Amino acid sequence: MQRSPLERANLFSKLFFSWTKPILKKGYRQHLELSDIYQIPTADSADNLSEKLEREWDRELASKKNPKLINALRRCFFWRFMFYGLLLYLGEVTKAVQPLLLGRIIASYDPDNAHERSIAYYLGIGLCLLFIVRTLLLHPAVFGLHHIGMQMRIALFSLIYKKTLKLSSRVLDKISTGQLVSLLSNNLNKFDEGLALAHFVWIAPLQVMLLMGLLWDLLQASAFCGLAVLVVLVLFQAWLGHRMMKYRDRRAGKINERLVITAEIIENIQSVKAYCWEEAMENMIESLRETELKLTRKAAYMRYFNSSAFFFSGFFVVFLSVLPSMLTKGIVLRKIFTTISFCIVLRMAVTRQFPWAVQMWYDSIGAIYKIQDFLQKEEYKTLEYNLTTTDVVMENVTAFWDEGFGELLVKAKQNDSSRKVSSDDKNLIFSNISLLGPPVLKDISFKIEKGQLLAVAGSTGAGKTSLLMMIMGELEPLEGKIKHSGRISFSPQFSWIMPGTIKENIVFGVSFDEYRYRSVIKACQLEEEISKFAEKDNTVLGEGGITLSGGQRARISLARAVYKDADLYLLDSPFGYLDVLTEKEIFESCVCKLMANKTRILVTSKMEHLKKADKILILHEGSCYFYGAFSELQNLRPDFSSKLMGYDSFDQFSAERRNSILTETLRRFSLDGDAAGSWNETKKQSFKQTGEFGERRKNSILNPLNSIRKFSLVQKAPLQMNCIDETLDEPPERKLSLVPDSEPGEAILPRSNMLNPGPVLRARRRQSVLNLMTRPSIHQGSSLYKKGSASARKMSVAPQSNMSEMDIYSRRLSKDSGLEISEEINEEDLKECFIDDIESTTSVTTWNTYLRYMTIHKKLIFVLMMCLVIFLIEVAASLVGLCLFKDGASRMNSTSNLNHTSTLDWFAVIVTNTSTYYMFYIYVGVADTLLALGFLRGLPLVHSLISVSKILHQKMLHSVLQAPMSTFNTLKTGSILNRFSKDMAILDDLLPLTIFDFIQLLLIVIGAVTVVSALQPYIFLASVPVVIAFVLLRAYFLRTSQQLKQLESEARSPIFTHLITSLKGLWTLRAFGRQTYFEALFHKALNLHTANWFLYLSTLRWFQMRIEMVFVIFFILVTFISILTTGDGEGKVGIVLTLAMNIMGTLQWAVNASIDVDSLMRSVSRVFKFIDMPTEEHRPTHPAKNKDISGVLIIENQHVKREKNWPSGGQMTVQDLTAKYLDGGPAILDNISFSISSGQRVGLLGRTGSGKSTLLFAFLRLLNTEGDIRIDGISWDAVPVQQWRKAFGVIPQKVFIFSGSFRKNLDPYGQWTDQELWKVAEEVGLKSVIEQFPGQLDFVLIDGGYVLSHGHRQLMCLARSVLSKAKILLLDEPSAHLDPITYQVIRKTLKQAFTNCTVILSEHRIEAMLECQRFLVIEENKVRQYESIQKLLNEKSVFKQAISHSDKMKLFPIHRRNSSKRLSRPKITALQEETEEEVQDTRL
């Protein structure tokens, strides 16, 4: 960044913002880069501002029992705030004085006041000076207030972030990520630009009092008639606003529904295409969109009438103000024109400035109190440790994760007089407190000495992770004693990668030791991986390590933990994403050798690990099931395998037990036993969803973290009703959310309290920060080119009879995200608060975009032409009326000099001729007609623009759904979703009304200039250069401002990225003590954004000031042209000066509106880009290499037409297949060929990332491919994409359950009857589950089917495949995250329902391969072997290296008696009781 010219600028340059000229000039001539931005002033640095506010807040906390954040802010910023407020007041006072001078100038042209004609020149000079003074006062004041608002936001940003890093885990469990993001975006954005309005809460009343005093002097009591009109107008606008908010609230729910479905579809686009559901999904979304648009139109009409009421109310205010005076004293032109000027200022103060100021204070005070409450939340308590301790001891520890339990626990401890703390060893000891709810850990005791390895095992939710959190101090024990040295290193279950290089992620701020670093790299098997990167360990990793595979992330996370020199290493399932060979090597070299002298606690379920551990702790439902050595385990606990692997799963419960479990599950999600309204009529069968839907989805839509959640179906804890829900208690303020677009999911969505009518739940489930920290990212398991292709390895979701650990983490069963869904779209700030990915677009919108936008809907051109015609009629009528009135009044003035009385003011002129009154009445009639025409002009325009938005959404949705997968591999998911959320919100809400305002203002200005020029032709000559100056200034500023806005948006992204990253790795940060380092990184991100935002504010003020300076010059010319060229008669000079004075504000408004239109049209440009995306049908398919198959295409096409039941056999031939994820990218599969016979079962083998999933995607034509694949002799070049994919049944890694009923999820096209659906549900084991839900098949699943276990969701996919009656079944690790029982159900179904089908299976488990006849081994992008299992075991292969002796025994039982005799395929009975070894998770 460059040094800012502001530091060496003089007073003149600062006053006129001339120091911004270099950046404006550079932005006009070339594209701006981040290096072109100026450094921020020292006073604006986040370090200084946060330190200042933190000091005052600490002072407030120390001095008072009831601290107030507003007091801390007052001590920091009050005096500067008041100084700029005083400047603003003085600038506004000049507006009230200007009409006085105008009245004197008009009066001087009365023939009776000829002796004052010479004073007119001085009055004109005074009027011009008032404009100059106002310009010099107003702009520095507004800029200063914006600057203070920016500083307040920065200081509060920092304060909130620092507090976030200190919050206790219990508090984090009750605060959603959406709330935190909302605190930093929704609430704090109010300070930036809103602070300039704050002073109008006292300026506007003073101004009204001053204006009413002046009007009283001019019109006496009739002045209050105009004020009464304004009060009525304000009440009318308030009523319109209330009506509009009702429509918007109802519409917000519909927007949520549409965006939920859209987000789910985009996030699962591979599944949508694999199932050929594009048309069904498109119809579903468009149906929701139609309902949404009906409410959008109603809300837009309300806002249109609100805006129009302001524009057209001016005439009635003036007319009713002067009417009583006119009827009693006659028409006095001076009074009329002076009243017009007074009323314009009065109208702005009453209807705009004061309401806006009140709203700003209301919102800001509410935001301050919310931030204050947040800053007073319970903090993470650092336990006191004994550094000389070498052992790790836990004695009789019991702890709770219960939701809403934090405050209860604190109060209980405070009130427990028997609580004692040992002063000897400074360890925490807690006494018994009787509380309801099952503890997550119950009476846990163990002791491990230095250098020992403790293996912690147990089923899902047993309390393994909670045990580690207890040791780290994240979970505070209710009772018991913990003892260790406190020097801890930690590797989380779901690897956390911070943005930075590989080296930075491993060293993580610890002092660098080359030898230790290299040893750790080698032990964690990272040497080969790092050597493949061009930059080696200096390769920069994106947020979450998106460019790495899940295994690579896991190893880097483990290396980070091992590199730190600690006494105790906590390793939470570090091998979850590794293939079995890598896992064995790392366990031996790293855990057993490199860390041999260190105390280690390893969470694992592998038998090999348990055998080598010094001590074993098996947890079951939070209790210690076993503690001791492995040799004791088999003797004392022969049933340990079921506890270890979660064999107590849902499917083993009796029917009565299952029924009670499901009933309890449903009860937790309903306020009462009644059903709520739903998406459609069938949704009445659903449980109560009101108020929960938006909260659940706010953390899943456009999700930068789009997690794979860990649920258990069963939770026995009672529904907590005291969960934090700030949104229920807060005022119904307008909100918006800001999520970084650098995240894979980013956008702002409207949030609604209601998906359907009904009461709001007091305890709405939301995604807690704790949940965010305890589940993987969407990218876990995916590689650089397999973006999102491999799901994270998830824990088994076997339900527990009591609330499990993972249940407690995810007790709200919500999908996660860092996104707050706003209740409605914030009209004022929406366009400012979205970040978008870096675009290589021009700095201004092209004319082609405008032309295409206007011509996409035929009626829009007609409406625009109608607007032009109505405008011409209005201008013509105005000219005729004004001329008649002016001339008539002038003639009467000359003949009525003797008719005035001495009781009137000495310069007043009374017009008593009756014809003049007729002229006035005619003018009133013309004005009423023009008012009606104005309403007629705007309403069709708004309606047509919303219709354009509808058409654009239809076209874009169709294009996206039909786009090839290569498009989705190159685009961020968030970028796509932003088009449907951010840009469609702009097209629906902001753009129509902004275009209307711009056209309305432009026509007003043109009309006023036309009238003034017609009355005084010389003024037209003066207006030409002024118009040219405006156009040039706008073009000059627009190029730079749009680039600065784009840079500012890009700079805003790291702030929220860093927040979410910090939250995800908060436990790691605390374990490593890196809070200060991350605070510094956050301040760096804040400073970067501040530099861009401050420069934008400065250049904006430069432009506004230049616009006003040009107008002041224009007004000076108009004033003196009028004074010098006007003879006797008040009419002409009155009209000219009044219109010229009031053109100023309108013209500035119009220029700003034009800039807003240009900015908003960039959304239209982005939408057009998506509309123009290529479609799959037109994507060329490359022929097989060295093969000319064109000669048989005609025959095959004819065959396809004849064979209606193709494919009939399922025989596949793959020839020279090459597959890539990106055009021009590396080949993931390179020139492979093989064939599969009809009905054959083939297993795919290979290490993680070898290309097994890629091959399945290639079969479905989801990748860029070359070569040929034939099914039953038909080439894929001869069959349309949709028909080709229908030949396959698919069970993907990533289960796709969209928000809809069971029926829709199984049969979105409605092809099957209920009987057929029930038959298939029974066949796959889902019938008993579906029957437990109200409505059964019509029960509505939301949020990815969170009420179902992962196994049940997998069975849904299996049911779809059965219904598809496909001849070829593709299974991509279907058992990766299943409990053993559900896995056996799938095996049974595959065996029975797909007997005659070709099955291609990618698996890690040996058991899953038992039914396969042949195996395809993929290594280094090629097919290495394609043989039977017997041949593979006789040859050197990955399979032979990975398989253990016990695995061979399972595959070949006879081998134990006679190794020379082998079975070609062992017989397996469904749901057989497996032995201890069979239960093991054996992976390849």
Curated annotation (Swiss-Prot):
InterPro entries reported for this sequence: AAA+_ATPase, ABC1_TM_dom, ABC1_TM_sf, ABC_transporter-like_ATP-bd, ABC_transporter-like_CS, ABC_transporter_C-like, CFTR/ABCC7, CFTR1_ATP-bd_dom1
Cellular-component GO terms for this entry: apical plasma membrane; cell surface; chloride channel complex; cytosol; early endosome; early endosome membrane; endoplasmic reticulum membrane; membrane
Motif PDZ-binding: positions: 1482-1484
Positions in the Cytoplasmic compartment: 1-77, 147-195, 244-298, 359-859, 944-994, 1039-1099, 1156-1484
Domain ABC transporter as annotated: residue spans: 423-646, 1212-1445
One GO MF term: chloride channel activity
Protein species of origin: Ornithorhynchus anatinus (Duckbill platypus)
Residues carrying a glycan: 893, 899, 913
SUPFAM superfamilies linked to this entry: ABC transporter transmembrane region, P-loop containing nucleoside triphosphate hydrolases
Protein name (database record): Cystic fibrosis transmembrane conductance regulator
Cross-link (Glycyl lysine isopeptide (Lys-Gly) (interchain with G-Cter in ubiquitin)), chain numbering: 688
Biased composition (Acidic residues): 1473-1484
The protein's Enzyme Commission number: 5.6.1.6
